[in-house]
């Protein structure tokens, strides 16, 4: 089983302090095969960006990087 792209993004960011660029997140997701598209193509940075935009309660953007929001 693979994760949803949002879950894979959370997983990747939970390991990295300071956040990552969407290109870096997509590269890690593809390398580790955390999310596999139905058509078999690699996850793109645009898909990561779209997932981040759909989940503004989870992710923050700052200085070109995506970070996890801390939920208290």
Tell where the protein language model's regions lie, with residue ranges.
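Charged low-complexity interaction tracts in eukaryotic proteins
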Residues: 2-6, 16, 20-23, 29-72
């Amino acid at each position: 089983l693979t994760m949803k792209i949002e879950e894979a993004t959370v997983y990747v960011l939970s390991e990295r302090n300071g956040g990552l660029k969407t290109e870096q997140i997509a590269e890690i997701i593809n390398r580790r095969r955390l999310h596999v598209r139905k058509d078999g193509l690699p996850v793109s940075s645009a898909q990561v960006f779209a997932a981040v935009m759909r989940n503004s309660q989870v992710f923050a953007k700052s200085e070109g990087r995506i970070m996890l929001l801390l939920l208290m």
